[in-house]
Amino acid sequence: MKTEKDKVQAHSASSKSASVSDMTVGSPLRQICKFALPLILGYILQQMYLVIDAAIVGRWIGVGALAAVGASSSIMFLVMGFCNGACAGFAIPVAQAFGAKDYRKMRVYVANAVRISAVIASVVTLLSLMFCHRILQLVNTPADIFHDAYIFLMSQFAAIPFTFGFNLFSGQIRALGNSRQPFYFLITSAVVNILLDVVFILGCGMGVAGAGIATWLSQALSVVLCIWYIRKHMQLLIPHGDERLFDNKRTSILLNNGVPMGLQFSITGIGIIMLQSANNALGTTCVAAFTASMRIKYLFTCVFENIGVAMATYCGQNLGARQMSRITKGVKDAICLMLVYFVFTFIVIYPFADWMMRLFVDSGEAEVVSRAAQFMRIANYFYPALGLLTILRYSIQGLGFSNLSMLSGVMEMIARCGVSLWLVPALTWTGVCLGDPVAWCMADVFLIPAFLWVQHRLKEQAI
């Protein structure tokens, strides 16, 4: 039975449409688009920042510095991917409780998620800083860029608590259907980051260390903004009294959602590190080409990723409300949306890939431009496979089957390891270009039957 306090806060939630959004009513496509658009704009902005950051590093410090930042990218994906995945998993029970209108349970989840996140962030930060040098050695980082890569990576690892904090609190805000505020915070963080890049790199001559410190400070700002917004406008999320106490059952549910999702990203990251290691062995030119192409690739593929993130919240809320037919309709609508976007990317990438790569390096670096453009075009052919992967994976996560989504990450890892061991030695750079497409297709082979099984399982439970 709901307390009087819950009833008041439920009324507050319904009246403050700017703060929360109920995705269990209305057109599924409209709800998904409404939720995904701020996410997409935010991530495009974030990726544009990374493009500008790479351009500043590549043009004002040099190709070697750009390669140093790129040599760290796969390691960052491994570590930060775990943090981001775990926080996304912690938001799933919050979304489900919100969809079921059980606000007390929701706040218990929030309190325990904060407690778990503080422990995980501390441990991950300590281990990352301790083994940073050794990890760079294991991935065959070229000697001429090793020092810069080490400095940059250490500065990124020092920012893990802030990265974890932003993903945790923004995930809880999004669990209530509000994706706009995290978007505004990303805008603020990105602008501050770019300004600090200019100050530290161009003004102070701090090199790649300046880029790392700029990221550290901007991430800290984004955490402060999230906490301020929750306290000011989303009191529904703030635990009170015994809701703050440790709850073994809720903690177990949070870990069952968060750890598999975190491991999924880390397992995928292992495959990316294997691919990065194989690419590093090809020399600084290929490392720089990989860095430039990945920056532009993420600018385009973040749309697929964020349609998926929208599906996790959408499925979580509708599962809580026991509306299975809306879940199926939403997945179909998301797939149609993904295919329309793929057509747009093909029209843009195929003719303009070379031009986009020249943003990063001087016109004299023709080989870097050519290789990076080849990477972009090959990956673009397989974007439908990536779009299907993100929609199905996040939908499965939102429905509470995070272990299955983790197994899809295992499939990606196996595929990338296979490419690294056999295709890259045989095809050199072309083999590197095939790493992502092969991984996406392998994951889809697993995810399609997995999603159909989850649908069948939940329908049986509802009978």
Regions found by a protein language model. Name each.
Residues 1-36, 94-159, 203-259, 315-382, ...:
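Short alpha-helical transmembrane segments in multi-pass integral membrane proteins
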Residues 87, 155-174, 182-190, 211-224, ...:
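Short runs within selected transmembrane alpha-helices of multi-pass transporters and secretion channels
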Residues 23-60, 74-89, 93, 118-125, ...:
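N-terminal transmembrane alpha-helices
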Residues 78-81, 125, 193-197, 223-227, ...:
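Hydrophobic transmembrane alpha-helices of multi-pass small-molecule transporters
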Residues 66-126, 163-182, 289-353, 386-408:
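Small-residue-rich hydrophobic transmembrane alpha-helices
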Residues 34-53, 155, 166, 189, ...:
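Transmembrane helical elements of multi-pass membrane transporters/channels
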Residues 57-77, 143-148, 208-209, 250-257, ...:
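Interfacial/gating helices of multi-pass transporter permease domains
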Residues 48-67, 136-143, 199-206, 266-299, ...:
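Helix-terminus/linker motif at the lipid-water interface of multi-pass membrane proteins
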